[in-house]
A protein has these predicted regions:
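Bacterial Sec-dependent N-terminal signal peptides
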Residues: 1-29
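Preference for extracellular/luminal or secreted protein segments
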Residues: 23-83, 296, 317-587
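Second-shell residues forming the walls of enzyme active-site clefts
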Residues: 55, 92, 102-117, 127-129, ...
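Short, acidic/polar
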Residues: 71-85, 152-162, 247-254, 316-323
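Short acidic, glycine-rich surface-loop motifs adjacent to enzyme active sites
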Residues: 81-97, 182-183, 258-281, 473-485
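Active-site-adjacent structural elements in enzyme catalytic domains
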Residues: 99-116, 147-167, 354, 359-364, ...
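Short, conserved catalytic-motif segment at the N-terminal edge
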Residues: 583-645, 666-668
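Active-site-proximal loop and beta-strand segments within enzyme catalytic domains
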Residues: 616, 628-729
Length: 729
């Protein structure tokens, strides 16, 4: 079913406006994918007709999603036939492998099934997460650095297109966990970051793109897997937090996803004592979590999936599929043993532990989603040309644009960036890692400046390290390009690398790699995070250094004590050039004293705020804003503020002329002005010194309202105004 994006957006706005405050039970927001279907007679008729044809055991089977390997062995084909013909499962999840094998098995399975199967996929960063030879998109932690969420929406649309191409209707993505624990062994870069608001925005943008492309999004891992140090694949993590903490961090993205009308939710294997007091009971099996919190309190009406029930985080809880359905889940994912677990559900109904109405309601919901996702009739994937359709030029361009939009300038001390193009001045490029990996960077840099390339090899001797440091010290600017992720062999060099010249670090690696050389990075004049060493990213970073391209990324997760979440300096082609003071005979140390002078003036009440700009030979040496507009509580002064300047003739005319003459030694500041202007010797100005003139303290009014002269026509003999231009007007 194709959903027009504008309609989805409109419905999102309606849905978002119907939710009450978090302190109250949320008003119901129907998921957008089924919003229209619930009023669609054809949908209800199809669901009713299928329900009438299914036995009760088959209705139970519709609630199970079986995981199978995409291989065409005899044993695997027999297993596929068994789970479809005997257990009548409602869906399949293929583990990793070849795309062609998965598609062939999907077509075979759909032909065998009595009711079209819901084909699911675990593709957090696209099909490449599970299938070889597919387009590789950036990880979520990288995408979290992108400011423009429209790109995330476009990304979701593209992943949906690819899923539909291979016969997939459900993607178990996005990860809505807030990764505020850097030691998290399982979520980490799968998360969009550590700011709950930013994570929520990214989740909604990506998931809305998926669903507008006709694929069900599934936010995971409810109620939040971000602040754990245990992998739920191996054991049961515990979230020992208060409810207030859960509401503000872990639950926040999920609540916003519900408000946005997204259709799927996966419950993780997590122990949350403040919600579920039974020790060792995972959220996926807890009615307090699934039904009371997710379905009732948060009013989620979409499809609820368990995380994979084969994981060790849920082991030791008896028949976990039965427990999951009793807790309120709609579909159980990856059951261990269908032969035991489906009969256990039927037996529980006979005992009154579950009602037939529960199963009927869940089955009806599953069928409604199948209808909406285009499964009202069987369809098959066309294998011919499939790989070319997925790996399209448009897809490659989107991957490129996502990577470029994530480039983040983490800091820019003394406005060292952008650099100015100057073929007469050579910049040193130190390449850390295989020099061939940063050839694209070096080639692009050479377009703007003369370049001297140096290579830092792993495990150099201290003598070799010192020779390299000495060589680099002869350059006025140094660019350090890091493409190597294991920096331990390079630490001895960086431990003593504190150059006097500005050093600009470029990381074509995950951001956390810079923590291995933290001291050197802290000393850097600028740090740019490129995330990957693709040629496109390298060329873009080179362009950003010279303001030939834009960069406006913001850090999605803090990097130790180096950079906080949200760090990011915007560089655009309009960013003014700044220059190194020493190259023009000035001292950076002296310029730093400007800060204390400007702040002292604010403390003494001379002015509420100011901007100080130092130029030399037309180049900006210093540009910094201090204080506020009018005092405490008013907006801060920014370098982009526009000023109404008055009395400029003194500073831009007379003062500059005097400064020039003084530099040439033509007078001393203690000279009397009449010594240089003889006509003043017979006036009361004869004893005034040049220094006193520069104080500008005559006591005259600060300005004269000349415009008032135009009000009184008698003040001027003649016509003040004319309807046309002439020699007088």
């Amino acid at each position: 079913m194709k959903i027009i994006p504008s309609i989805v957006t409109f419905l999102f706005l309606i849905a978002a406006g119907t939710v009450s405050s978090p302190a109250q039970n949320a008003t119901t927001v129907e998921p957008l994918l089924v919003y229209k279907a619930l009023q669609d007679k054809d949908c209800r008729h199809w669901v009713d007709s299928v329900m009438d044809k299914l036995s009760f055991k088959e209705k139970v089977g519709q609630l199970f999603i079986y995981t199978i390997a995409p291989v065409n062995t005899k044993r695997n084909l027999e297993l596929l036939r068994e789970v479809i013909d005997t257990y009548k499962v409602g869906g399949l999840l293929f583990s990793g492998g070849k795309m062609q094998n998965q598609v062939e098995l999907t077509n075979r399975a759909q032909r065998q099934a009595k009711v079209p199967l819901m084909i699911t996929f675990d593709g957090e960063w696209g099909l490449a997460m599970r299938l070889r030879g597919m387009p590789v998109f950036p990880r979520n932690m990288v995408l979290g650095c992108i400011r423009d969420n429209r790109l995330l929406y476009e990304y979701g649309r593209e992943v949906a297109r690819q899923c539909r191409q291979i016969g997939v209707q459900v993607n178990f993505a996005p990860v809505a966990d807030v990764n505020i624990n850097p030691e998290n062994p399982v979520i980490n870069t799968r998360s969009f970051g550590e700011d709950p608001i930013q994570v929520a925005d990214k989740v909604i943008a990506y998931a809305s793109g998926l669903e507008s492309g006709g694929v069900l999004s599934v936010c995971k891992h409810f109620p939040g897997h971000g602040d754990t140090d245990v992998d739920s694949h191996k054991a049961l993590p515990v979230l020992p937090f208060t409810r207030e903490r859960l509401d503000s961090v872990e639950l926040y993205p999920f609540k916003e996803a519900i408000r946005a009308g997204l259709g799927g939710m996966m419950v993780g294997h997590l122990q949350v004592p403040v919600i579920e007091p039974i020790g060792g009971l995972p959220s996926s099996l807890s009615r307090n979590v699934v039904y009371d919190l997710l379905t009732d309190e948060l009013a989620f009406k979409g499809l609820i999936f368990t995380d994979a029930l084969a994981m060790k985080g849920v082991a030791g809880n008896g028949n976990v599929s039965l427990q999951a359905l009793k807790a309120g889940n709609d579909m159980v994912l990856s059951p261990r043993n269908l032969k035991e677990e489906i009969p256990a559900v039927l037996e529980a109904i006979e005992k009154g532990e579950l009602t037939r109405e529960d199963i009927e309601s869940k089955c009806r919901k599953v069928l409604t989603y199948k209808y909406v996702l285009g499964l009202k009739k069987k369809s098959y994937v066309q294998l011919s040309g499939l790989e070319q359709r997925i790996n399209s030029p448009q897809t490659r361009d989107l991957v490129r644009r996502l990577n470029l939009a994530a480039i983040t300038v983490l800091n820019n001390k003394n406005h060292i960036l952008p650099l100015h193009t100057d073929k007469e001045q050579t910049i040193a490029l130190l390449e850390v890692g295989d020099p061939g990996e940063t050839d694209a960077l070096a080639k692009q840099l050479s377009r703007y400046t003369s370049l001297a390339r140096f290579s830092l090899r792993a495990n150099q001797t201290e003598e070799e390290n010192q020779r390299l440091r000495d060589s680099l010290s002869t350059y006025k600017r140094i660019i350090v390009a890091v493409s190597e992720q294991r920096l331990a062999p390079y630490q001895p060099f960086f431990a003593k690398f504190v150059p006097e010249s500005p050093a600009i670090y470029l990381f074509f690696t995950p951001g956390k790699m810079m923590l291995q050389i933290q001291r050197a990075v802290a000393h850097a004049s600028a740090v740019v995070l490129g995330h990957s060493y693709s040629s496109d990213v390298q060329r873009q970073v080179a362009d950003v250094l010279f303001a030939k391209a834009s960069a406006d990324g913001q850090l999605s997760a803090s990097l130790g004590e180096l950079f906080p979440t949200g760090a990011g300096v915007t560089i655009t082609p309009k960013t003014p050039l700044h220059f190194v003071p020493e190259e023009y005979g000035l001292s950076s140390a002296h310029l730093k004293r400007i800060d204390s002078i400007a702040l002292d003036g604010i403390r003494q009440g001379a002015y509420p705020g100011c901007q100080v700009v130092v130029l030399k030979n037309g180049h900006i040496m210093f540009d910094k804003a201090f204080g506020t507009y009018t005092g405490k509580g008013s907006p801060r002064v920014e370098s982009t503020n526009i000023y109404d300047l008055a009395s400029l003739s003194k500073t831009t005319g007379t003062l500059l002329a005097i400064m020039k003459l003084y530099d040439k030694g033509r007078f001393n500041l203690t000279d009397k002005i009449s010594d240089h202007l003889p006509f003043l010797q017979r006036t009361d100005k004869k004893d005034i010194t040049i220094q006193e003139i520069l104080y500008h303290q005559s006591g005259l009014p600060s300005w004269i309202p000349f415009y008032q002269e135009a009000i009184d026509k008698d003040s001027y003999d003649g016509r003040l105004f004319s309807a046309r231009k002439d020699v007088h007007h």
